[in-house]
Amino acid sequence: MRHAVLGAGGVGGLIAAALAEDGQDVILVLRAETLEVYPGGIHLESEVVGDIDVDVPAVGRLDREVEVLWVAVKATQLEDALRAASPAVAGNALVIPLLNGVDHVSRLREVFGDLVVPGAIRVESERVGPAHIVQTSPFAAVDLAPPPALRSRAEAVAGELQSAGLSCNVRDSEAEVLWGKLAVLAPFALATSSVQLPAAGVRADPVTSRLMLASMREVGEVAATQGAQLDPAIYETALLNMPAGMRSSMQKDLAAGRALELEAISGPILRLGREHGIPTPATEELVRRVGAAQAL
């Protein structure tokens, strides 16, 4: 298939390099400042697919029809990224967002209509230099939740990711894919960022660990109002078994002084909690602590 990847950070770079190394036709769509220093190929160090050096062409604006458009930018960068990928150029491409949070899906549907296939990725991966991606988690797993009319096309995409060495499953429930990720991501990102410690450090801190698990249960209650039935025992196990050294992308952004995806990750939980009368005190406290850490 012909793939375009919008954004070449930890997630976009991983997807692009793995697919290109496996022989797929891949092009990157990059911001001007990233394109300026792009060396013409990706160097990937990955615990899942191994080390890869592969040439991948890049442009500043999508300039050709593709079959799949991966949206792999930060939520804070989405509006700028959309200006570089016109639906008129993308044609009939499946649009697969791998952003954190849930609110981006409705925005993408405003632009691309029924071609959006919501997705989620579980991975620790970061860009450490121009086109230099380091993926350190022992897993890199993608879930896709296509509408019925796009299921066969999504299954073909999943097959290509699997051929490239990444885990990919096609699920029936969009709500469970998006909220299932958020049930782990939000508590973990907020907890690790609030104390600037990796997973093991959070687990060793009784107060932060308690807040993290309580936040996870709050996310589950909110998720139920959106049609996602999540088993809290599964997500508690996931949080308590994160690799000891694993850090969240929010934690890394905070340490580097970059903009945080705080609204994208915590906003839907707090907003929908208020709308449905569901208390979210643990999530609120973690958000407060992240804000305090950000102000230092």
List the predicted regions and their residue ranges.
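Short, well-ordered alpha-helices that flank and scaffold nucleotide-derived cofactor binding pockets
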Residues: 17, 21, 83-87, 106, ...
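Internal alpha-helical scaffold of NAD(P)-dependent oxidoreductase catalytic cores
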Residues: 87-88, 107-114, 119, 130-181, ...
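Rossmann-like NAD(P)(H) cofactor-binding subdomain of soluble oxidoreductases
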Residues: 49-132
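NAD(P)-dependent Rossmann-like dehydrogenase/reductase catalytic/cofactor-binding core
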Residues: 213-296
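NAD(P)+-binding Rossmann beta1-loop-alpha1 motif at the extreme N-terminus of oxidoreductases
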Residues: 1-51
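Short, charged/polar "capping" segments at the starts of alpha-helices
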Residues: 34-39, 105-106, 152
